[in-house]
Swiss-Prot record:
Superkingdom of the organism of origin: Eukaryota
The entry's keywords: Cell membrane, Disulfide bond, G-protein coupled receptor, Membrane, Olfaction, Receptor, Sensory transduction, Transducer, Transmembrane, Transmembrane helix
Name of the protein: Olfactory receptor 10A2
Example of a GO MF term: G protein-coupled receptor activity
Annotated organism of origin: Homo sapiens (Human)
InterPro entries: GPCR_Rhodpsn, GPCR_Rhodpsn_7TM, Olfact_rcpt
Ranges in the topological domain labelled Extracellular: 1-12, 63-86, 148-184, 246-258
Cellular localisation: Cell membrane
Predominant location category: membrane
Protein family: Belongs to the G-protein coupled receptor 1 family.
Role description: Odorant receptor.
GO terms for biological process, alphabetical: detection of chemical stimulus involved in sensory perception of smell
Membrane-traversing stretches: 13-33, 42-62, 87-107, 127-147, 185-204, 225-245, 259-279
Record-linked SUPFAM superfamilies: Family A G protein-coupled receptor-like
Amino acid sequence: MSFSSLPTEIQSLLFLTFLTIYLVTLMGNCLIILVTLADPMLHSPMYFFLRNLSFLEIGFNLVIVPKMLGTLLAQDTTISFLGCATQMYFFFFFGVAECFLLATMAYDRYVAICSPLHYPVIMNQRTRAKLAAASWFPGFPVATVQTTWLFSFPFCGTNKVNHFFCDSPPVLRLVCADTALFEIYAIVGTILVVMIPCLLILCSYTHIAAAILKIPSAKGKNKAFSTCSSHLLVVSLFYISLSLTYFRPKSNNSPEGKKLLSLSYTVMTPMLNPIIYSLRNNEVKNALSRTVSKALALRNCIP
């Protein structure tokens, strides 16, 4: 795996850095889940989908970071064949699910801003459950086909995966068979999985922008924009890092550069999402304050 060539001092520093990011990610996303469940003011579709995103980010992080920390701490740079396949499967599953969940969240914002009076009716509990299921489901077939197909090839020669986790391109380099058909499928599949949700997000925000421009008061425009600014920032971070990783020309795509870019959406984005939503969203900040106040009051009541 990836960090074996680095000096021990650098590996120790990376371990402390990634451990801190990992703990912040877990605590931040768990806090979002608990607050949106505990506070009745946040029992709306928007926070239902935010809760799904936090569950997803925790899963995404658990797939990659613990093994990476173990590699840095114990200097054990090996991973089993089954472990590599499992890691790749869940990486694809959570990655695809996040693409579609971000599109679903954009649609939720579109309904909230463009049809505010019908919002509770359109986004009822049954509809939001169906949308959440539709967001999570595509990860299963994509991950199953991609992982099963890739690991059905024979491997020979070097067994070194030049990455910090089992992603498809570095594992594919170890295959000693004709992979042309698989590569076509992988490219087309990646484009579809990334572009379809991206187009849905663009469509939603085009309608949102048009609706905001029609609002007469500046206060109304600011309020409407604030409801979707956090999501827009999260989408931008995720898609920019994803595009730079998988859609750059090969001539500009060195293995070391790809590792750094992969860190942005596998490690940094899951940490930043709860920070963005908590700092830029007054409802979440107020709910956090109420939850902390209730917890302190309950603690004072206990003798």
